[in-house]
């Protein structure tokens, strides 16, 4: 870290906290689009849950790499007041707003590209957004992550069907997207294999944690 500071003439004191603070940081992200001003805003909130050795946590310097795509898959230029911006957002405060100008139409955000930081990400992606990222994102991690979230959505939906005694089904749109991956697998066989791999059991179970806690609390009240 010291060498990086000297080479780039920057203060990385906050970044050093990664080496002394335990636990996995979480990023809660929401967005808004203003059609009148063609402005897109990302609101990012960071937190790190208390751990046995550290109940009090401090804000970290979290590099959040992003990309924005329009509905046709064209990558948007990141700019603010005519000035080009880096695709890495420096999250250093508990709550921050990042504003992008010249965005014509609500974009699809690819968040945490290249897994730019070891954090948990909470953003309410729609199925349509995930299908778009899987189809045209130029970042391999973003495509793989979109596929994992799509699989999780489908698995959760079918668990609900099973609980209600209904038949299993897979969204035709998801099948079409996966078929597209297969049709173009020769471009990157290793990536295609990863994209078509279902989430691990523990990762899928983790996605149910909030739901199970809510159900347990409701049962206790009864």
Task: Give residue ranges: language-model regions.
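Amphipathic alpha-helical substructures
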Residues: 1-40, 156-179
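Short, well-ordered helical secondary-structure segments
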Residues: 6, 16, 20, 51-56, ...
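Beta-strand-rich binding/interaction modules
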Residues: 12, 26-91, 96-103, 107-110
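Long, ordered, helix-rich scaffold segments
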Residues: 12, 101-216
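Flexible loop/turn segments at secondary-structure boundaries
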Residues: 23-26, 49-52, 140-142, 154-156
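A short, hydrophobic C-terminal helix/tail in secreted or cell-surface proteins
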Residues: 217-222
């Amino acid at each position: 870290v010291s060498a990086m500071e000297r080479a780039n003439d920057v203060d990385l004191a906050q970044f050093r906290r990664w080496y002394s603070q335990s636990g996995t940081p979480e990023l809660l992200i929401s967005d808004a689009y203003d059609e009148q001003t063609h402005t897109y805003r990302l609101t990012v909130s960071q937190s790190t849950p208390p751990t046995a050795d550290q109940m009090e946590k401090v804000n970290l310097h979290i590099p959040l790499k992003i990309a924005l795509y329009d509905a046709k898959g064209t990558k948007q230029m990141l700019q603010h007041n005519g000035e080009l911006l880096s695709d890495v957002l420096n999250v250093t405060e508990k709550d921050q707003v990042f504003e992008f100008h010249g965005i014509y139409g609500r974009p699809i955000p690819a968040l945490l590209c290249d897994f730019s930081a070891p954090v948990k990400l909470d953003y309410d992606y729609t199925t349509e957004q995930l299908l778009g990222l899987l189809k045209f994102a130029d970042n391999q991690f973003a495509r793989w992550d979109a596929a994992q979230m799509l699989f999780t959505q489908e698995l959760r939906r079918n668990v609900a069907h099973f609980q209600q005694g209904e038949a299993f089904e897979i969204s035709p749109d998801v099948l079409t997207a996966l078929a597209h991956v297969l049709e173009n697998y020769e471009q990157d066989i290793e990536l295609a294999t990863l994209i078509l791999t279902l989430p691990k059991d523990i990762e899928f179970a983790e996605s149910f944690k909030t739901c199970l806690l809510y159900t347990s609390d409701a049962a206790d009240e009864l």
